[in-house]
Amino acid sequence: MNQEYLDFELPIAELEAKIEALRAASDDKVDLTDEIKRLQKKSNELTKKTFANLDAWQVSRMARHPNRPYTLDYIEYIFTEFEELAGDRAFADDKAIVGGLARLDGRPVMVIGHQKGRTVKDKVSRNFGMPAPEGYRKALRLMEMAERFKLPIITFIDTPGAYPGIGAEERGQAEAIARNLREMAQLTVPVICTVIGEGGSGGALAIGVGDKVNMLQYSTYSVISPEGCASILWKSAEKASTAAEVMGLTASRLKELNLIDNIVQEPLGGAHRNYAKIAENLKLRLKEDLAELDGLSKEELLNRRYERLMSYGYC
């Protein structure tokens, strides 16, 4: 996969281009190893400096990075024996939501998540990660299956929001989201939710009610996009950077507000720079969360989940 850089990463991109050019020019007659090492060190230092001071708008753009790992990527790296399950048994199979049975270090679990696309065709097929009601009903069907078989549920959140099209509204988008919120609050199995990219409004919440809610370092979670907020408050999407700052949508800010439990650190430069490393970090987090939740009874799980939901809005 070709590395793509955001505008604030352009100085890093220039250094990386020079490094690649030197590697291509290096041969048995011309040894450029020392110069390559010098530039690599400079690139790493610049990357550390750049990513140590990202503002909320830059984090928002990182959360949408086109090379960022999606749900199926994490499934490939973290789980084994994944068996995808399709359809809501009522209308259709929504490819913006994927899910199925898998094993986490041998332990059976149910995995569910939003899925965006890479190619143009795949993006259209996945509806850019925006589920319709049938997607949320599929997710609920899999959660109910997990409940019957006493399987922990692991969800990955990455969506701009639920699809707002006329057809989706006619098929009961609001009802599907509301039902998921209610049913997830009553599940008697452990539920671990992780925001891996964009956590957009009710479309994210519909698979986001859990005993543990984690966020990747450069993910976001908010009731509206910065552009949408800016369009409402300032009548201009150009104020998106200002909106992002006041919305408190970053993992660090949400952790301060006790709205999430943990922040999963990303590799230097973001999750898209090293799929294996971010998957390793996330897998460790999931295993630690499961180990903690395994020690709780059904009543304790439900009481803690209820207390968590009732605490929202209080600092």
Swiss-Prot record:
Pfam families: ACCA (PF03255)
Keyword set includes Ubl conjugation: no
Location(s), subcellular: Cytoplasm
Ranges in coiled-coil conformation: none
GO biological process, one term: malonyl-CoA biosynthetic process
Keyword set, alphabetical order: ATP-binding, Cytoplasm, Fatty acid biosynthesis, Fatty acid metabolism, Lipid biosynthesis, Lipid metabolism, Nucleotide-binding, Transferase
Top-level class of the enzyme under EC nomenclature: transferase
Main location: cytoplasm
Pathway annotation from the record: Lipid metabolism; malonyl-CoA biosynthesis; malonyl-CoA from acetyl-CoA: step 1/1
Superkingdom classification of source: Bacteria
InterPro entries tied to this protein: Acetyl_CoA_COase_a_su (IPR001095), ClpP/crotonase-like_dom_sf (IPR029045), COA_CT_C (IPR011763)
Keyword Lipid metabolism among UniProt keywords: yes
Ranges where the CoA carboxyltransferase C-terminal domain occurs: 38-292
GO molecular function, one term: acetyl-CoA carboxylase activity
Family: Belongs to the AccA family.
Complex formation: Acetyl-CoA carboxylase is a heterohexamer composed of biotin carboxyl carrier protein (AccB), biotin carboxylase (AccC) and two subunits each of ACCase subunit alpha (AccA) and ACCase subunit beta (AccD).
Main function: Component of the acetyl coenzyme A carboxylase (ACC) complex. First, biotin carboxylase catalyzes the carboxylation of biotin on its carrier protein (BCCP) and then the CO(2) group is transferred by the carboxyltransferase to acetyl-CoA to form malonyl-CoA.
Protein name per Swiss-Prot or TrEMBL: Acetyl-coenzyme A carboxylase carboxyl transferase subunit alpha
Organism listed in the record: Haemophilus influenzae (strain PittEE)
